[in-house]
């Protein structure tokens, strides 16, 4: 194989020499090797240039593809955001609709519980006022207040709308009438208060129209019974051992105090027993007030006499405070003072105590239908 290669090399060398001669070059030593290298260098440069150009073309071809991919990603994101926005909008609307639906459901339930006619609200208000009035009975109420409340209640009951449970209301009214019949004692007033509370609850469920007349009649009888409430003593008077006593809240001289008691059918207090004396003395000392009693020696100095004309019993003389009565400066009228009695000038203004007999109360139901005696108002306080 070496023999075959040598002729080829020789031929290549001869070809190069001929080319150089044609170009006017002189043949020198080592020239052959340099020309061979230069001949191969151009080929290498061409290969390198082609490689660089190919790489550049590849990179340039990739750049539009990257831009296209980024644009596609942005389009996808935009579409996703659009869909998400639409979904959120639908979710918000659904939430609002759900909230509105719940509100309407509650409103529907509330409306479903409403009474059929606006009259029920008026009845409820009337019963509330009636309950408040009766709740204050033990303190400083009057029969006139109860009468007015029952009159208004009677007027509204006549307009009651439909719905049943009349029997329950009828029973409540029967119990209420029975409680009113037992009212002479203050403790019974609480019973009426409870009955009225139950009546209010029953009326809230309303009877049928056909039964309204029966309820109207019951309330009319009840009103008459309340109007004739039998009490041992008028309002603001205190009961003790069959008598009623009024303690004034203002002051007058002795003679004006006598007149004030007479104007209400009573008299300035006349003491008849030791128990009564102790009761009155306690009332006076608790209030820390000096109060006139119906005792004086105006007609004859030293002779003490009650306003009913009876003389002072010798057994009562020990109720005078020590050194009393002393008649200093024309002191002719007796008063409750501290733990005993004192004489003072009759023109001095003091509190006073009236006394009258207590009413006789019968629990017979027929008595409620009979005219009741007029109840005296307390004297101006």
From Swiss-Prot:
Q: What is its main location?
A: membrane
InterPro entries in the cross-refs: C-type_lectin-like, C-type_lectin-like/link_sf, C-type_lectin/snaclec_domain, C-type_lectin_CS, CD209-like_CTLD, CTDL_fold
Single Gene Ontology BP annotation: endocytosis
Residues involved in Ca(2+) binding: 324, 326, 328, 331, 342-343
- Short motif (Endocytosis signal): ranges: 14-15, 16-18, 31-34
Q: Where is this region: 6 X approximate tandem repeats?
A: 96-303
Q: Which residues are glycosylated?
A: 80
Q: Whom does it interact with, and what assembly results?
A: Homotetramer. Interacts with C1QBP; the interaction is indicative for a C1q:C1QBP:CD209 signaling complex. Interacts with ICAM2 and ICAM3 by binding to mannose-like carbohydrates. Interacts (via C-type lectin domain) with CEACAM1 (via Lewis X moieties); this interaction is regulated by the glycosylation pattern of CEACAM1 on cell types and regulates contact between dendritic cells and neutrophils.
Task: Write the protein's name.
Answer: CD209 antigen
Organism, by scientific name, is Symphalangus syndactylus (Siamang)
């Amino acid at each position: 194989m070496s023999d075959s290669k040598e002729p080829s090399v020789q031929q290549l060398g001869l070809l190069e020499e001929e080319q150089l001669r044609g170009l006017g070059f002189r043949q020198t030593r080592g020239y052959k090797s340099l020309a061979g290298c230069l001949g191969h260098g151009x080929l290498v440069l061409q290969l390198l240039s082609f490689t660089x150009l190919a790489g550049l073309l590849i990179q340039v071809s990739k750049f539009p593809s990257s831009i296209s991919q980024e644009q596609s990603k942005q389009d996808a994101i935009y579409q996703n955001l659009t869909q998400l926005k639409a979904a959120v909008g639908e979710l918000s609307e659904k939430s609002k609709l759900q909230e509105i639906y719940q509100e309407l459901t509650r409103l529907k339930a509330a409306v479903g519980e409403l009474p059929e006619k606006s009259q029920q609200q008026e009845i409820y208000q009337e019963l509330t006022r009636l309950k408040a009035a009766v709740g204050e009975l033990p303190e400083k109420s009057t029969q006139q207040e109860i009468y007015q409340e029952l009159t208004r209640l009677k007027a509204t009951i006549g307009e009651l709308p439909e719905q049943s449970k009349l029997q329950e209301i009828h029973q409540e009214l029967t119990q209420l009438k029975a409680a009113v019949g037992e009212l002479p004692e203050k403790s019974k007033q609480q019973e009426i208060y409870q009955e009225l509370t139950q009546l209010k609850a029953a009326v809230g469920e309303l009877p049928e129209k056909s039964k309204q007349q029966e309820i109207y009649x019951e309330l009319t009888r009840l009103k008459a019974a309340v109007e004739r409430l039998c009490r041992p003593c008028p309002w603001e008077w205190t009961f003790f051992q069959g008598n009623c006593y009024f303690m004034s809240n203002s002051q007058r001289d002795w003679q004006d105090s006598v007149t004030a008691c007479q104007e209400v059918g009573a008299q300035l207090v006349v003491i008849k027993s030791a128990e009564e004396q102790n009761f009155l003395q306690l009332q006076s000392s608790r209030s820390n007030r000096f109060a006139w009693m119906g005792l004086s020696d105006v007609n004859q100095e030293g002779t003490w006499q009650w306003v009913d004309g009876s003389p002072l019993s010798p057994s009562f003389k020990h109720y005078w405070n020590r050194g009393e009565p002393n008649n200093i400066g024309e002191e002719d009228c007796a008063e409750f003072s501290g733990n005993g009695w004192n004489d003072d000038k009759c023109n001095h203004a003091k509190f006073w105590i009236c006394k009258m007999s207590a009413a006789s109360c019968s629990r017979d139901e027929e008595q409620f239908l009979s005219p009741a005696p007029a109840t005296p108002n307390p004297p101006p306080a």
